[in-house]
Amino acid sequence: MRPRVQTAAAWPRVCIESVTPSVDNGRFPVKRTVGDRICVEADAFCDGHDRIAVAVLWRPADAKTWASAPMRALGNDRWRAEFPLERIGTYEFRVEGWRDVFATLHADLEKKRAASTVLPVDVQEAVAVVQAAHARSEGALATQLQDILTRIGAQSEPLQQLAIVLEPDTAQAMALADDKPFRSEYPVTFRVESERRAAHFSSWYELFPRSQSGDGQRHGTFDDVIGRLAHIRAMNFDVLYMPPIHPIGAKNRKGRNNAVTAQDGEPGSPYAIGAADGGHTEVHAELGGLEGFRRLIQAARAHGLEVALDFAIQCAPDHPWLQEHKDWFTWRADGSIPYAENPPKKYQDIVNVDFYASGAVPDLWNTLRDAVLFWVNEGVTLFRVDNPHTKPFPFWEWLIADVRGRRPDVVFLSEAFTRPKMMYRLAKCGFSQSYTYFTWRNHKHELREYIEELNDGVPRECFRPHFFVNTPDINPLFLQTSGRNGHLIRAALATTLSGLWGMYQGFELCEATPLAPGKEEYLDSEKYQLRAWPERAPGDIVDEITRFNQLRRMHPELQSHLGTRFYQAHNDQVLYFGKFLDAGYLSRSRSMVLVAINLDPQAGQDAEVEIPLWELGLPDHASVAVEDLWDGHRFTWHGKTQHIRLEATRPFALWRIRAGEVA
C-alpha cells in the first residue's frame, strides 16, 4: 500500500533508536536497587545540520506527572542522562527529541560573529525567534523574556543586540520556552524495578529447623532455631533461610537416604507438603506451630536477621487440595495421579498441580498468590521458589507483579537449575535473584566466561546471580575431594564474585560426605532425616566465613557481580580480578579492590600478575598504595607486574589499591 504524502510528512524527522537500559525493547523491566541512578542512553539525530534537543522523562509508575532532564551529547549521535531511584517500586521512563531552533540559531550566529559576517537581517531573525517564544510564554518566564527583549530594544547597534541574544541567560530562558518543533518520542515506555538492597546484596544461611535440637533423635523446633541465631549473626549473615515448614504428608513418605518407603518414626521430606493438618498456610506441629514461627520472626529481627521461606508449589498425595480441589490436578484414566519427576530424580512422595486444569484458572492461581500473601502478613518478605521453571511463565509474571504491586519490598529467589534462556526468562518475569551454574564452574576459564556472560547484555539488566556453594540437593564433587582447602576456595569465589551468596549448614564444618562416590547427594541427607550440627568443629572455616562476610559489608565493590573485570595472571590455577562500582566511581576514587584465588586445593601457586594501573589513570611504572584487606597490612607496589603466591591453606588474597598514595 502506498503511503499518502500527508501521512509521510507526519513521520518523525528526529530519529530515536537503541534506547538503554532495556530488556527485550521494554517488554520487561530492568532491575536496579533503590538509591541507584539510572543511566539512560539513546541514539538521536535529525536530517540536515540543525541542532536537536533530547530529554529523558521519568516517574514512579503510580505518579501522575513526569520529571524531565536534558540528555547530553556523547558524540556519534549518542545521548545520555541520569535519574535517581528514590523509593522502591516500579519506575517508568521515556525518551523524546525535537529540533532545537534556538540552539541551531545560536550556533550559526556564534560562527558568524567569530568570522565577522553577521548581517543586520541575521539579528532581526534572531530577535523574532525570541519574540515568538515570549508570545507563547506565561508567568515568570514571560517576564524574563520580556526583560531580554527590552534590553535588546534599548540597543541601537545590531552587534550589541546580538550579544544579548547570545547570553547564557537568554539560552536558558529560550530552552524553557521551547515549543519543541518536530517533536518525536521513542514508541516504548520503559520500566525499572527499583528493589530494596537485599535484592542485590545479602548473605544467606540455610538450615533445617528440625535439625537444630542438638540431638539427632529429637525433632527440633523454632525455639531451637532461636538458640542458633546469635551464632549465625556472629558469622555476619543477613538471611536465615529454611526449607518448607508445612505439614509433611504421610502417604508415600520417603525414608532415610531417599528410601522409597519410610520406617516408623521417620520424618519424611519437608518438600512433600500437606497432610491432614493442612497445607501451604499451615505450620508443621512438631516445629512449634504458627506461634513458634512468630517467635522466631521476632527473635531474628532482634538479631538483625531476615527470615526467608521456601515456596514450593507441590503437594504430598494427602494434601487437602487433592480432595477439596480435584479439578486442580491431572488424573489418569484409572483414577490415580502421577508422582513428580525431574529425570533422573523421582519424587514418589510428591504430586504436581496442573495450572491449566479445568478448575485451576483463576482459583488455583489466586490460592497460590494468597498463600504468599499469608506469609508476607506474617513478616516474611524473602521467598526462595522451588523449581519455578517447571511452572508456567505467565503464572510467575502475574503472581510476582500482583504481590509486589501490594508489597514492593517482597523479594523472590528463583531456584531454577535449567537452560540459560529459561533462567533469564524467569528473571524477566520478575524474579529478583536466581541460583546459577556457579556450583559447577571450577576452572579459571569457566568462571571467567560465566561472570562475563552475567555482566553483559540481557543478564546484566535483569538477572542477579545468587552463588550458593552447596544446597541440600547438591554436594559438589569438587568439595567432596578437596577438604578444607576446597571449601575455602569456593567460599572465596562466592563471596567476592557476587553480591549474593549462600551456604547450607555443614559447609562451614567442611562436611561433604557423599551418598556414594560420584554422586552429588549428601550421605544421611537431612531432607529425609534429623541431624545434629555442632556450631564449631576441628578444621572448620567459621572464622574465614565470618571475615569474608565482614569484608563484603565494608567494601561496596564486593556487593555486586557487576563491575568485575578479569586481569592477567600467568597461571591457569590463579583467578585474578578487580572489582569497582562503576566507571565514574573508579575515576573519582582512583581506588579499587583486587582479588586473587588459588583454584588448586592440593598445592600453593605462584603467579606474575598485572596490576591494572591503567584503570586508575596511571602509567605502567607508577606506584600505588596497597592494603591487604584480610590482615590490614599496608605496603606499596611499584610498577605494573607483581609476583604473588597463594598457599593451598590460604588460597586467596584481597587488596585495595589507591592511586596518589604511597604507604
UniProtKB/Swiss-Prot annotation:
Transmembrane segments: none
Active-site residues from the entry: 386 (nucleophile), 415 (proton donor)
Gene Ontology MF terms: alpha-amylase activity; hexosyltransferase activity
Catalytic function, reaction form: alpha-maltose 1-phosphate + [(1->4)-alpha-D-glucosyl](n) = [(1->4)-alpha-D-glucosyl](n+2) + phosphate
Region listing for Disordered, in residue ranges: 252-276
The keyword Glycosyltransferase appears for this protein: yes
Keyword Glycosyltransferase: yes
Top-rank EC class of the record's enzyme: transferase
Residue sites binding alpha-maltose 1-phosphate per the record: 254, 314, 349, 387, 527-528
UniProt-recorded name of the protein: Alpha-1,4-glucan:maltose-1-phosphate maltosyltransferase
Organism this protein belongs to: Xanthomonas campestris pv. campestris (strain ATCC 33913 / DSM 3586 / NCPPB 528 / LMG 568 / P 25)
